[in-house]
Structure formats: structure tokens, C-alpha cells
Amino acid sequence: MKKIKIGLMGSAGRMGQEIAGVIEANPRCELVYAPLRGEKWDSKKAQAVDVWIDFTSPEALKDILKKASETKTPVVCGTTGFSKKEKELLKTYSKKIPVLWSSNMSLGVAVLNEALKAFSAISHFDFQIEEIHHNRKKDRPSGTAITLQENLEKAVDKKLPEALAIRGGGVFGVHKIFAMSDEEVLTFEHTALNRTVFAKGSVQAAEWLVKQKPGLYQIRDVLFGKSKK
């Protein structure tokens, strides 16, 4: 069986190290290139990559997409904190190569986002999203909370209060959605127990993305197929 050759951007970070470990344990994949910041670009190694996984920074996005498009290599991007302009870059390059970007690579969160569609039946309820992360997380609310908010507002067809963001300790990630009426409270909750959940989701996304045509994809597409718009 031919292994999928993965290139990893951001391998020195916590998530990068976790992803490298997941790739090593996966019999279907192998890590062939993990360039470090400031290191000279190795075109020969880059040519061998079947799919990139990127967990770096918004500032690095343009260069990564440019290099990937030169070799027609798909990109799985789990970086968050993108500006509107940077999100447009994802769309632009997805016309040339397959690009999968999600604010959260957890398969459970993908299912949670899909489940939010059911809230359209109780759109008259009050809603609130709450998220908790470790005290080192810079963006607040988190990219995951913003995505949940966007999908929830789409489902219930109204503007909702901004997500409550709590920072403390070493929490990997807790996201709660409250739906409240005078008579009842419905709570959806997702808790990440470790970083491995995001690493496994990223590698599964990479295995899926190598078979896709150019386009902009999300982690939910790995589970449910490309949504029609």
C-alpha cells in the first residue's frame, strides 16, 4: 500500500508535535517534510509532498498557499485568527488546489455544527454560546465559537449575543450551546480532552483531501460530503 506523504508546517509548535506523532502512528501516512521557520526551502522535498497540514500563523498563510499551488499540492489548514482578507486568500487559492480550512479539526465539533441545524425548529428560544480555553489562548472568542455562532445564527435566522469567552488553566477546549425558553433549557456541549483529537482530525482530513478536486472544504465535508450551496 502506497503511503500518503505529508508535509507539516508548524511542526515545532504544540499542535505540530502532536500531529507528527499521529502521522507516525498511522500506517497509511508518513511525514516526509517538516520545514522550520527561517529554514531554507527545500524544493525537492516539497515536490514529494502529497498534502500539506498547516498549523502556523495567519501571517504565514499567503506564502504557504503560494508554495503549495506551485506544486499543485492540497492544503489542510487548522490555523485560526484569520482576517477577512486572509479568508479571501483561502477562497482564491482553492480555485487552483484543494484547500480544507476549519477553525476546529475535531470530528465531534463537526457533528455539533451539523446538529445546530435542528435548532431552526425552536428559533423562538433564547440562545447563548459559551467557550472555555487555556490561559495562553490569544483569540477570544475562539475560532470554533465564532463558527458555531455563525451556523447557529443561520439556523435560527436571527442575530444572537456574542459568545462568552473564558480563559483559565490548561483547558483544551469546552464549547456549550444553550437554548432557553420559559419552560426548559437545552444544552449541547463538546469537551476536548487533549490535543490528539485535533491532530487525528487533521490527519484524517489530509487523507480525504488528497482525493478531492480543487475547492474550499471544511472538516464537516470529510464526514458528510461537500455541502451544496
UniProtKB/Swiss-Prot annotation:
Q: Spell out the coiled coil positions from the record.
A: none
The active site consists of H133, K137
Q: Which organism is it from?
A: Bdellovibrio bacteriovorus (strain ATCC 15356 / DSM 50701 / NCIMB 9529 / HD100)
Residues that bind NAD(+): G10, S11, A12, G13, R14, M15, G78, T79, T80, S102, S103, N104, M105
Would I find Cytoplasm among this entry's keywords?
yes
Q: In the UniProt record, what gene is named as encoding this protein?
A: dapB
Name-wise, this protein is: 4-hydroxy-tetrahydrodipicolinate reductase
Which compartments does it reside in? Cytoplasm
- Specify the pathway: Amino-acid biosynthesis; L-lysine biosynthesis via DAP pathway; (S)-tetrahydrodipicolinate from L-aspartate: step 4/4
Q: Which UniProt keywords apply?
A: Amino-acid biosynthesis, Cytoplasm, Diaminopimelate biosynthesis, Lysine biosynthesis, NAD, NADP, Oxidoreductase
Instruction: Write down the superkingdom of origin.
Output: Bacteria
Q: Which GO terms describe its molecular function?
A: 4-hydroxy-tetrahydrodipicolinate reductase; NAD binding; NADP binding; oxidoreductase activity, acting on CH or CH2 groups, NAD or NADP as acceptor
Family statement = Belongs to the DapB family.
Residues annotated as binding (S)-2,3,4,5-tetrahydrodipicolinate: H134, G143, T144
Protein function: Catalyzes the conversion of 4-hydroxy-tetrahydrodipicolinate (HTPA) to tetrahydrodipicolinate.
GO biological process terms held by the UniProt record: diaminopimelate biosynthetic process; lysine biosynthetic process via diaminopimelate
Q: Which reaction does this chain catalyze?
A: (S)-2,3,4,5-tetrahydrodipicolinate + NAD(+) + H2O = (2S,4S)-4-hydroxy-2,3,4,5-tetrahydrodipicolinate + NADH + H(+); (S)-2,3,4,5-tetrahydrodipicolinate + NADP(+) + H2O = (2S,4S)-4-hydroxy-2,3,4,5-tetrahydrodipicolinate + NADPH + H(+)
Q: Name one GO cellular component term.
A: cytosol
The EC number of this protein is: 1.17.1.8
Q: Respond yes or no to whether keyword Oxidoreductase is given for this record.
A: yes
